[in-house]
Amino acid sequence: MQKFFVTSALPYPNNSSPHLGNLVGALLSGDVYARFKRNQGHEVIYLCGTDEYGTTTMIRARKEGVTCRELCDKYFELHKKVYDWFNIEFDVFGRTSTTKQTEITWEIFNGLYNNGYIEEKTTVQAFCEKCDMYLADTYLKGYCYHDGCRENRVISNGDQCEICQKMIDVNKLINPFCSICLTPPIQKSTDHLYLSLDKLTPLVQQYLDRVEFDSRIMAISKAWLEIGLNPRCITRDLEWGTPIPINLDPKLEKYADKVFYVWFDAPIGYYSILANERDDWREWLNSGVTWVSTQAKDNVPFHSIVFPASVIGSNIELPLIDRICGTDYLLYEGQKFSKSQGVGLFGDKVAEISPKLGINEDYWRFYLMKIRPETQDSSFNLEEFVRIVKTDLVNNIGNFINRVFSLLEKTPYRDLNYQISPEYIEFIKKYEVSMDEFKFRDGLKICLEMSSRGNKFVQSTKPWTMIKDGLDTQEIMTEAVGICWILLNLLKPIIPKSACDMLSNLDTDNQNIFCLIGGSNINIRILNIIKLPFKNIDLKQLREFIEGKN
């Protein structure tokens, strides 16, 4: 048994609900992987929480006329409600606006400061006179100046261009403007603290040389190194955030009115959220744990460059991320998700309309894993969603399980001894490799292929004619039920509620399917007959519910 620390990129609690792209990129991917590892028999802690500090929270709180704390309390509960509905099974779900977060951030900063990796700079920064505030990178927009984007007049945030994925120097943005009031900012000098990434480059390179990132994740990380790492500002002129430890050095007293940049201390939240849950968090993390992080591709450089540089430079004995499970972007009907523009489906809406449609979270989980943007951007399409539910969930998986148990109901066989065949051992092996490599689409594809094989087996053996003629069908039914049992076990990480509900009707002497790769027998007792597990979705009705017409 191994230990796995699975974390999903911490979502901002500055909106009422995450959209489906947020869910599939980090949280659902983390949940599927954590469940898979638990099914293998490993010890797993799956952790996430809300990333509560920063400009986005301040702006949202200002709009709603509440304090930042009140806003975070409100949206923490709303987000957790959505994640619970989608059956995302966290072992720990916390938040970053805690005393532990401050303590651990200070510990890391103090190490960096004492080791000479923090420098001071007086910089000229964009200041919006209308909003009376310095503009954080995410609230300063303009045209990206990098090749390819400059010619196409791509509008970028001030931290990183979403199109070319390159870092942005805010002073080089073309025609910058405040994203809040849309007016051009003035330039105003201010003092800030910088993380000396240039000095930390060799240590980051050593880290990247030893971790097991796949080629896509490594390419994103190495691209930053090839451009060259420069000192990065880690403080902001804000009120809401982790304060600077000004008592460390009298020189730091002038930073009393500043806080740490959210991307400096947000990943530290993985430590602090766990620390708030268990006192032995350091001991557990340093006990040979494999750390797997799930996230969208735009978060990768902060987790593979900035975060490890900070921890390594502090010289504190804390583990770092071993593997990153990254995705591209999920679009909605070909467009980028946007609540303000009414584009996309959001978690709270999905939870609202699903009971009206007579479906549960597994329908959405299934389709989202089917289209998971693993190697390129993909798009959620309502017509395709309805079609996939019909062809894959109802006609393939559902039909196979229903046929087997409808036939079994007509026989006296309730205690079966199943010898797994070499063909299905290979299915399990291929599935295990795919899931371990974060190829969840391939894992689901293997399940669908297995179900199709099962359907063909039933069709070719025609047990219904033998039952009608009073002939012995125990061998056929044992094989068919055994295939169902394997299939449902492999589907547990993807559609856990449906798979576990069906498996509860089967009592076995072995709950770990991956132990059967050696070819062991398994005894299966039928407790209840499984009924038709899935239903079709009416597209017209689905659209009406989404549009609020019903």
Swiss-Prot record:
Q: What is its EC number?
A: 6.1.1.10
Q: Which InterPro entries match?
A: Anticodon_Met, Met-tRNA_ligase_1, Met-tRNA_synth, Methionyl/Leucyl_tRNA_Synth, MetRS_core, MetRS_Zn, Rossmann-like_a/b/a_fold, tRNAsynth_Ia_anticodon-bd
Q: Which reaction does it catalyse?
A: tRNA(Met) + L-methionine + ATP = L-methionyl-tRNA(Met) + AMP + diphosphate
Write out the residue ranges of the motif 'HIGH' region: 10-22
Q: Does the keyword NADP apply?
A: no
Give the record's keywords alphabetically.
Answer: Aminoacyl-tRNA synthetase, ATP-binding, Ligase, Nucleotide-binding, Protein biosynthesis, RNA-binding
- The residues that the entry says bind ATP are 339
Task: List GO BP terms, alphabetically.
Answer: methionyl-tRNA aminoacylation
Task: Return the motif ranges for 'KMSKS' region.
Answer: 336-340
The protein depicted here goes by the name Methionine--tRNA ligase
What species was this sequence derived from?
Acanthamoeba polyphaga mimivirus
Taxonomy, top ranks, is: Viruses, Varidnaviria, Bamfordvirae, Nucleocytoviricota, Megaviricetes
Gene encoding it?
Answer: MARS
